[in-house]
Amino acid sequence: MTMTAADIRLRQNPILTALLLGMGQGTMVAEKLFPRLPQVLSSVNLAKLGDERLRRYNLRRAPGGPTKRVNIKFEGATYSVDQYSVEVPMPRELLREADESRKLQVGNYLDVSRIAMTTASDILGLDYELEVAALATNVNTYASGHVLALAGATKWSAATGTPVTDVRAAADTIRKKIGKRPNRLTLSADAAHALALNPQVKSYLPTTVLGPASVEQLKTILQVEEIVIADAVWVDETDTGRDVWGNNAILAYVPRISAGGGADISLAEPRSEERRVGKECLRLCR
């Protein structure tokens, strides 16, 4: 029998490159909208103050007269964290095989331990992203007047759409509600595409700019400190890829949370975080 290439390799099939085919994932932005609390406990008591410092009082007094006393409202609420978990089993024999291949430097090999850990991490991250997106794009999450539904000629993808007017009006609504201007605009992939090519947006650009508006230009035009584009996708039961964030835009004030106390991990679960973190959003539905 004539010897074949497989016989020369003793019928082994080495991995000849360091490449591994697989599906990638877009940018996940859940923590940009609902930041994790630096909290390692599964239950926490959160203090909440009233709006006393935003109200006006009659502070005028006669010499020696009584001063105005303002009582601070304090509300303490206890929140618990739900747990999520996933298993990606990997036979011990395969782990040992990869371990020995690495020690013996037998060509390239699959780092199955890393693949399993990355897969589990990505699954948990996508589940978190989906839950946050469902909460943030639900009209029932917001107060009356804080959701703008666009259709037909008002859509940002339409030539007559007015995203600059919409975003600036939404920013003013948030400012009047909480006393702070929104600092973050979260855009789905579709919303970002429509916004960058919108005629009203391009009218703010120099005449020398022929292409779509960049993120930096959009930040200046819309007067928003940060713009994040949500590219994450998920595959449904029909094997169809779908955008996690649909065609939505969410304008919000997101507080900056430092890791006070040196905590470097968080057990916070998306739904609990939304209730824990004080913020105000106005959703713009494209």
Region roles according to the model:
Residues 122, 215, 276:
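Short, cationic low-complexity segments
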Residues 274-286:
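Single conserved hydrophobic/aromatic residue that forms the stacking wall/gate
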Residues 23-91, 118:
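Assembly/oligomerization interface modules of large self-assembling protein complexes
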Residues 99-181, 189-204:
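Alpha-helical scaffold segments that mediate packing/assembly in large oligomeric complexes
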Residues 92-100:
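Acidic/histidine-rich, surface-exposed loop or edge segments in extracytoplasmic proteins
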Residues 10-13, 37, 56-57, 257, ...:
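Positively charged, low-complexity intrinsically disordered regions
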Residues 1-38:
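N-terminal alpha-helical "arm" segments
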Residues 180-272:
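Extended oligomerization regions of viral-like shell subunits
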